[in-house]
Amino acid sequence: LRRQRQMCIRDSLKVQRRGIYGTMERDVAMMQRMLRFVPPALKGLVDLERVISEFWSAAKEEMDFLREAANMETFSKNNENVVFVASPKLYSELTTAQVLVMEYIDGYSVSDTHTLEQEGYDLVEIGEKLADNYVRQIMQDGFFHADPHPGNLRIRGGKIVWLDMGMMGRLTPRDKSLIAK
């Protein structure tokens, strides 16, 4: 990869483990077969078939790196004018359904409050900007990061950097209107 790009700084590769799709498919099929053995009382509490189906849908989306690359492009475009938000640069010409190539992001985890304070960051300001951006993603863009845990958020150069766009949520205008009420 480095020979293909002269301007290489530091890149990050996300590589799909060989055979993972088939393994997951078999695991989901086994979970569906095991539903026969769940006591009727438990079946009434939770729609386990639906839970397994939702899990499989989400897993398939996360295993498609071309979809994640498209999510990265959409997220980047939606936030291009938000001065305190960034995301990794995508190298789409090198990305495939099984390999995602992007800029490596260092920086501080949002949960590393001690270091952030030592480096002069205002934790309240970070929290306010994070909340502001997340509400904007939901209410304005209708396209939001669906896995916003500390491992997917970094602080670098005064910006909040969002990582891992494998799971993104989408809202229709009607959905946004209902939430606003």
Where in this protein do the model-derived segments appear?
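Hydrophobic residue at the +6 position relative to the catalytic HRD Asp in the kinase catalytic loop
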Residues: 151-155
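Single conserved hydrophobic/aromatic residue that forms the stacking wall/gate
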Residues: 1-9
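Conserved catalytic-loop position in the HRD/HxD motif
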Residues: 147-149
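Amphipathic alpha-helical "output/dimerization" segments
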Residues: 30-34
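Glycine-rich ATP phosphate-binding loop
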Residues: 10-16
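Extracellular glycan/ECM-engagement signal in secreted proteins
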Residues: 172
